[in-house]
């Protein structure tokens, strides 16, 4: 079972994401603030991260940068920030995907599945070489 960390300060959104992901058999942990989320992300192993950008404490850009400096795990940013500059910055810091709010929870699950499948293939290939 793949483990996913959601770092999202809006509890209703985090719970919606969690519910849809758990229905698809993912194990989900939620952190509702940036500092706790960053510590959780760096101290524990997850198969994928879902980050909000506008968080109390440490923002999603900083969390993305910190995760990417240590891990190659897939990162999906989900934010109300719709400007191209925010998307470009997030992707430039190492996010693998960027979704804007409001979003379709089913689409989020589909993107999670796609990123995890690709990441698992890359890991498998790296072990065979």
List the predicted regions and their residue ranges.
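N-terminal/domain-start alpha-helical segments
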Residues: 1-123
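Conserved small/polar residues in nucleotide/adenosyl-binding loops
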Residues: 128-129
């Amino acid at each position: 079972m793949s483990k996913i960390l959601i770092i999202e300060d809006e509890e209703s959104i985090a719970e919606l994401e969690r519910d849809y992901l758990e229905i698809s058999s993912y194990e989900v942990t939620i952190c509702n603030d940036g500092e706790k989320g960053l510590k959780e992300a760096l101290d524990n192993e997850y198969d994928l991260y879902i980050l909000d950008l506008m968080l109390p404490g440490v923002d999603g850009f900083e969390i993305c940068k910190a995760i990417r400096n240590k891990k190659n795990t897939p990162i999906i940013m989900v934010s109300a920030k719709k400007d191209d500059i925010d998307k470009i910055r997030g992707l430039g810091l190492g996010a693998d995907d960027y979704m804007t709010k409001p979003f379709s929870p089913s689409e989020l699950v589909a993107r999670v599945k796609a990123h995890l499948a690709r990441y698992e293939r890359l890991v498998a290939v790296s072990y065979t070489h």
